Amino acid sequence: MPGTKRFQHVIETPEPGKWELSGYEAAVPITEKSNPLTQDLDKADAENIVRLLGQCDAEIFQEEGQALSTYQRLYSESILTTMVQVAGKVQEVLKEPDGGLVVLSGGGTSGRMAFLMSVSFNQLMKGLGQKPLYTYLIAGGDRSVVASREGTEDSALHGIEELKKVAAGKKRVIVIGISVGLSAPFVAGQMDCCMNNTAVFLPVLVGFNPVSMARNDPIEDWSSTFRQVAERMQKMQEKQKAFVLNPAIGPEGLSGSSRMKGGSATKILLETLLLAAHKTVDQGIAASQRCLLEILRTFERAHQVTYSQSPKIATLMKSVSTSLEKKGHVYLVGWQTLGIIAIMDGVECIHTFGADFRDVRGFLIGDHSDMFNQKAELTNQGPQFTFSQEDFLTSILPSLTEIDTVVFIFTLDDNLTEVQTIVEQVKEKTNHIQALAHSTVGQTLPIPLKKLFPSIISITWPLLFFEYEGNFIQKFQRELSTKWVLNTVSTGAHVLLGKILQNHMLDLRISNSKLFWRALAMLQRFSGQSKARCIESLLRAIHFPQPLSDDIRAAPISCHVQVAHEKEQVIPIALLSLLFRCSITEAQAHLAAAPSVCEAVRSALAGPGQKRTADPLEILEPDVQ
């Protein structure tokens, strides 16, 4: 409501949503709830998809409601206070860098964000002539940065081993563990390990659920659940021996797709906090809320500037969707760190939409020699690990066809002669090229380069008169803006392809325990049947044609994930089996006869005796997270 906000905002955020009501999908964590804004996402055209996803992104900046303050938000006093405290702890390490280290850690999207931010802040420190103090850990190692290897985040011991390697011999280590849903065992193990040695370690947990919604099922190789670890951290926060930063940002526009808002909010929160620490330590003062708010407003401005390009974003979405529909490919070619954003978007389509790694791929143009921990892990590993300029020119360019779409992502500070050369080479193969070009007021794209593109999403940023660290605000804005555009385009393209039911991705590949629980939640949501029955159907679909034995039923979730990861259409088959009360073989036949997965499920839901729509998820038992 106007007039009730504590702070002045750059953008208009949506009114507090239905998802904030305590009874809405009560048993499901916020990060897995369905967003009421997008309940008809599957019926939207490209323009409306951009509008709806833009509204979901704006919820990141929503303040706590005056009448309805169920959850703490990014601008809540408690969150801002914790951010100031953590920034102060980072400053202590910056002031005495010998033996100091800041570790950013996570699995999947969170690990890729950890990678991107450690690269950025090391770059900032090198530019000041300082020794870089940041490193990153990603479940599964460097290969997980450029390829989809999601199952790796399910081991707490793996997380601890990796942390011990990088922290060996250090005297003061701040470990920022990122888990959007407060669910990744990889991070839980690290946080627990840090709490057992607070003389050296300071654990900081970042996620976007209340601690009461953190995952509470057993971790296979650890004695505590994620929720128990987070509760222990909250107790230690009273003495500033651990910190939990977990504002609510609302459900994802595509249910559970934490690469979107979860990834963006991670970037916004941590870059704000860390940049405030660097800016103020150089001035010899402590970080303040005022400094945090100034930086947060620049990210709000990024939202405004990005979504002012909505018509062109919708056009790009349609072009990408057409290429994918014709079985063509989409290549996202980005310069410098915008190339990292491009790689992330392509990789994340694999597990989000069950896409082939060749469908949407990102490439990084520019030097990346000092970005990775273990560059050797990425050399000669096969086509899905290729991402460099050389890879694009030697293995992609020769095989480009007219049905492929290539998106060039650069700033006007990049080497525009190099951009033009690559664009000209691509244009000989396909006319489906687009540009996402970032400029500062006063810069213009050279005419010869401009003429090569039929359409350009041109984003102009205001001049920022900041000191050195302030230059990074512009870099962070451009990265976030690029992420918003690419996430919206790739998500929307798959919506237009008919892959989404309401705002749920039914046909995802179950590649980790989080996705196993999400699959179970969807079966309960759409079938209205009991948890026990849904588990039975899910296990039958996973292990088919092997009959379900008591041994299989009693097996740990990792065994089911291992089998499910290799299979397609597990969830739709399990759901059709529940809706038609039929065998797995009959469910497969129903699916094969339908034009698409979503059509098969829609017609089953509309059949005699079925519920017409999915009810809000009140049937889930509280222990299913």
Curated annotation (Swiss-Prot):
Belongs to the GCKR family. Residues 90-286, 320-499 form the SIS domain. Found in liver and pancreas. Not detected in muscle, brain, heart, thymus, intestine, uterus, adipose tissue, kidney, adrenal, lung or spleen. Beta-D-fructose 1-phosphate binds at T109, S110, E153, S179, V180, G181, E348, K514. Beta-D-fructose 6-phosphate binds at T109, S110, S179, V180, G181, K514. It holds the Pfam family GKRP-like_C. It comes from the Eukaryota. Coiled coil: none annotated. GO terms for molecular function: fructose-6-phosphate binding; glucose sensor activity; kinase inhibitor activity. Keywords: Carbohydrate metabolism, Cytoplasm, Mitochondrion, Nucleus, Repeat. The gene is GCKR. PROSITE patterns: GCKR, SIS. InterPro entries: GKRP_SIS_2 (IPR054017), Glucokinase_regulatory_CS (IPR005486), MURQ/GCKR (IPR040190), SIS_dom (IPR001347), SIS_dom_sf (IPR046348). Fructose 1-phosphate and fructose 6-phosphate compete for the same binding site. GO terms for biological process: carbohydrate derivative metabolic process; intracellular glucose homeostasis; negative regulation of glucokinase activity; protein import into nucleus; protein localization to nucleus; response to fructose; response to glucose; triglyceride homeostasis. Changing D413A: Impairs inhibition of glucokinase. Interacts (fructose 6-phosphate bound form) with GCK. GO terms for cellular component: cytoplasm; cytosol; mitochondrion; nucleoplasm. Gene3D superfamilies: 1.10.8.1080, 3.40.50.12620, Glucose-6-phosphate isomerase like protein, domain 1. Regulates glucokinase (GCK) by forming an inactive complex with this enzyme. Acts by promoting GCK recruitment to the nucleus, possibly to provide a reserve of GCK that can be quickly released in the cytoplasm after a meal. The affinity of GCKR for GCK is modulated by fructose metabolites: GCKR with bound fructose 6-phosphate has increased affinity for GCK, while GCKR with bound fructose 1-phosphate has strongly decreased affinity for GCK and does not inhibit GCK activity. This is Glucokinase regulatory protein. Residues 463-465 are annotated as: Essential for interaction with GCK. It comes from Homo sapiens.
